[in-house]
Amino acid sequence: MLEFFSRLSLVTKIIIAIILGIGVALLFPTVTPYLSLFGELFIKALKSVAPILVFVLVLSSIANFQVGHSANLRPVLLLYVVGMLLAAFSAVIASLSFPSTLYLNTVSHNNLQAPGSLADILKNLLLSFIANPVQAISEANFIGILAWAIGLGLAMRHSSDTTKQVMQDVSHAVSAIIHKVIAFAPVGIFGLVAVTFADAGLATLESYAQLLAVLLGTMLFVALVINPILVGLTIRGNPYPLVFKCLKESGITAFFTRSSAANIPVNLDLAERLGVNPSTASVSIPLGATVNMAGAAVTITVLTLATVHTLGIHVDLATMIILSVVATISACGASGVAGGSLLLIPVACSLFGISSEIAMQVVAVGMIISVLQDSTETALNSSTDVLFTAAVDIRSRQNS
């Protein structure tokens, strides 16, 4: 039995864990307090590993980033960044239009307040930026961690190849630890689902359904409205034939593999059939699999604002704009590990003074809905890589 279960995919295990958790909560509610330990251990593991994960992944990706390989790379990168920003803005609008409530353990955290003005926000950001790096990691100050990782990464871009390789090896080692933690997800989710449904009942299903609807709806909006607008402006023509071709031949494959990296060969093959210059595609598509994460920006923004709404924190427009920028920067590091967008939610939550403990509960909620969320997110991310690459190549041929 255990051997059969070990051969199942993580998605299948999570689905089984959710079903078992709901069943135990409805049939044996008196047992659920004993199952809470599984969920607590899972959240504690995520909370412990997240700071070093963010630091190492961002530092390694920036230190090893190479530019100048192709004349067409700059406009592709511009599309990547603009696309992620617009995706984050769309997520803000969707979250305001359809606010979601999460079931969180907020005992002793009811005094949370957002900064009162833009000046307060910028002051808090600056103070977080210049935090002691060791203290930032130990206290899970994700803004400080991000600042030091970016700064050191930029400084190490001129270091030797050996040093860069060491950083890459450390990044792979941290990712391996994360994979072990994620492998424990079905057990942790089983405990979390059982306790949540025992406490809140079937109303939890409605909450998760609305959260999923906002997430998936926003991603579809980005895929079918935002991306076509950007591509249309680039190629100065009807974008939808190219959009649908990329969604069909790249997005569907990525939906089931749930890995942008695994979908790189599919995208390179599609780019070749679309007549894209190989010197452009060979750089921009692997680069896109690393930094182009519009779906991750949506996930980070929606779940952060759902947390803010749940805790009753008032936020203004300026804060939301800053959140969109932070979500975009965070999304660039989301490719380092499975479920990376979820593990970077604490970075955005820290903008609102939300503790790491609560943020990790939100990550756990994200794990529960990740069966659909992660697949759709990957489909959007990966199909956008080849879409924007092809669009820039078409524009280049038009100008030549």
From Swiss-Prot:
Q: Which domain of life is it from?
A: Bacteria
Q: Where are the transmembrane segments?
A: 14-34, 48-68, 76-96, 136-156, 177-197, 211-231, 285-305, 311-331, 349-371
Annotated GO molecular function terms are: amino acid transmembrane transporter activity; symporter activity
Q: What GO terms fall under cellular component here?
A: plasma membrane
GO BP annotations, alphabetical order: serine transport; threonine transport
Q: Gene3D superfamilies of this UniProt entry?
A: Sodium:dicarboxylate symporter (1.10.3860.10)
Phosphoprotein is among the record's keywords: no
Signal peptide start-end = none
List where in the cell it is found. Cell inner membrane
Reactions that this protein is recorded to catalyse: L-serine(in) + Na(+)(in) = L-serine(out) + Na(+)(out); L-threonine(in) + Na(+)(in) = L-threonine(out) + Na(+)(out)
Q: How does it sit in the membrane?
A: Multi-pass membrane protein
Q: Spell out the InterPro entries in the cross-references.
A: Na-dicarboxylate_symporter (IPR001991), Na:dicarbo_symporter_sf (IPR036458), Ser_Thr_transp_SstT (IPR023025)
Keywords linked to the UniProt accession: Amino-acid transport, Cell inner membrane, Cell membrane, Membrane, Symport, Transmembrane, Transmembrane helix, Transport
Keyword Transport set for record: yes
This molecule's function is given as:
Involved in the import of serine and threonine into the cell, with the concomitant import of sodium (symport system).
Q: Which family does it belong to?
A: Belongs to the dicarboxylate/amino acid:cation symporter (DAACS) (TC 2.A.23) family.
Q: What is this protein called?
A: Serine/threonine transporter SstT
- What organism is the protein native to? Acinetobacter baumannii (strain ATCC 17978 / DSM 105126 / CIP 53.77 / LMG 1025 / NCDC KC755 / 5377)
Gene symbol here is sstT
